Amino acid sequence: MSKRPGDLACDLERSLPALASLGTSLSHSQSLSSHFIPPPLEKRRAISDVRRTFCLFVTFDLLFISLLWIIELNTNTGIRKNLEQEVIHYSFQSSFFDIFVLAFFRFSGLLLGYAVLRLQHWWVIAVTTLVSSAFLIVKVILSELLSKGAFGYLLPIVSFVLAWLETWFLDFKVLPQEAEEERWYLAAQAAVARGPLLFSGALSEGQFYSPPESFAGSDNESDEEVTGKKSFSAQEREYIRQGKEATAVVDQILAQEENWKFERSNEYGDTVYTIEVPFHGKTFILKTFLPCPAELVYQEVILQPERMVLWNKTVTACQILQRVEDNTLVSYDVSSGAAGGVVSPRDFVNVRRIERRRDRYLSSGIATTHCSKPPTHKYVRGENGPGGFIVLKSANNPRVCTFVWILNTDLKGRLPRYLIHQSLGATMFEFAFHLRQRVGELGARA
């Protein structure tokens, strides 16, 4: 009589230590799990990073004009007398006070429109720039500022340039980038609306591929003995070093399971955690129970990546570029586009180290470079942080195992970070779903 899923999960929890693994990259699923539905509009971040930078620049405009005006006031006759002359006895022809007021007008109008009201239209800055430009041109023509020396030239020019820089920044940076983020958000919502777990293909743009029978790291064989069997070039030694460092980071994450932060779980018992890794940032961890022998997952996910392409349609190409030694290799992977074309295809070059230990199978890796696959204009080159896949054997039942995927990836490009984080967990759930389907099919054939 078979055990209930809950009982199997309990058996697994009693038998498994801290786990980890490296997922080399993100290839967004065409459908997001309902457990990671993007937040509603009212709960999204109030102001984007690029808009906040724009508001800081507007503040700089006011402060810089104010500083120049104060310097101009602080002449031989004293700042108090000059301030009285320019403000109380204001004269359009000779006073700089109106240029300061103009800067304050831009500051208040732009912050009201784009920080307080968070408008997504250019009409506010069109008004402020038009008023500023017209006023400054008229003032330069009709006033006597040019007879006042350097500041007669400097203040109008600086004010004019800053006004147009603000226009350029909003029109070419803020609004286009926020529109792209909005497309991301709507694409994610549309994907969720189509229903979770209905597409063919899981995620993982940079899956760890290693040739069959090329595992190493047995309990009785040291790294020095393995590497001592062959003379390596400087580049090959660097690949081996990178692979060992990635494995060391994975082992450190394993030792800190109590510090994993719970994020989400689903009805299958899959759980996503996060942890902050020094120098590498936020790392996502998927832990899932599989009702199959660990060796089956080891073969499908780690040793035979070509099989993964059959059931993971988001990976369009995978190639082993170089086999450095038995347990170190360099791979090249290409992911398909996702989210209705919002995310363009990414390619990845990874160095991977594969080890077989008493209680687990481990594939760890990190981004690297290779002379045969330089970055091209065809794809955006993504970059993976250290992590890996781990297949954990059960001490009590050889017919079950636990699969753990640690994912630390940078997709590059102008992608909103908060939305990437929202979709990463959903992507990991999708991968677990299709992996479970795959091992179920293989088990039925056996």
Curated annotation (Swiss-Prot):
Record bears the keyword ATP-binding: no
Biological process, per Gene Ontology: cholesterol transport; progesterone biosynthetic process; vesicle tethering to endoplasmic reticulum
Signal peptide region: none
Record-linked CDD domains: START_STARD3-like
GO molecular function, one term: cholesterol transfer activity
Family annotation (Gene3D superfamilies): 3.30.530.20
Keywords noted in UniProt: Endosome, Lipid transport, Lipid-binding, Membrane, Phosphoprotein, Transmembrane, Transmembrane helix, Transport
Reactions accelerated catalytically: cholesterol(in) = cholesterol(out)
Residue intervals annotated with topology Cytoplasmic: 1-52, 117-121, 171-446
Residues with Phosphoserine modification: 210, 218, 222
GO cellular component, one term: endoplasmic reticulum-endosome membrane contact site
Subcellular location: Late endosome membrane
Topological category with respect to the lipid bilayer: Multi-pass membrane protein
Cystine connections: none
Transmembrane segments: 53-73, 96-116, 122-142, 150-170
Subunit structure: Homodimer. Interacts (via the MENTAL domain) with STARD3NL. Interacts (via phosphorylated FFAT motif) with VAPA (via MSP domain). Interacts (via phosphorylated FFAT motif) with VAPB (via MSP domain). Interacts (via phosphorylated FFAT motif) with MOSPD2 (via MSP domain); this interaction allows enrichment of MOSPD2 around endosomes.
UniProt similarity note: Belongs to the STARD3 family.
Domain free text: The FFAT motif mediates interaction with VAPA, VAPB and MOSPD2.
Its job: Sterol-binding protein that mediates cholesterol transport from the endoplasmic reticulum to endosomes. The sterol transport mechanism is triggered by phosphorylation of FFAT motif that leads to membrane tethering between the endoplasmic reticulum and late endosomes via interaction with VAPA and VAPB. Acts as a lipid transfer protein that redirects sterol to the endosome at the expense of the cell membrane and favors membrane formation inside endosomes. May also mediate cholesterol transport between other membranes, such as mitochondria membrane or cell membrane.
Protein name in UniProt: StAR-related lipid transfer protein 3
Lineage, broadest ranks: Eukaryota, Metazoa, Chordata, Craniata, Vertebrata
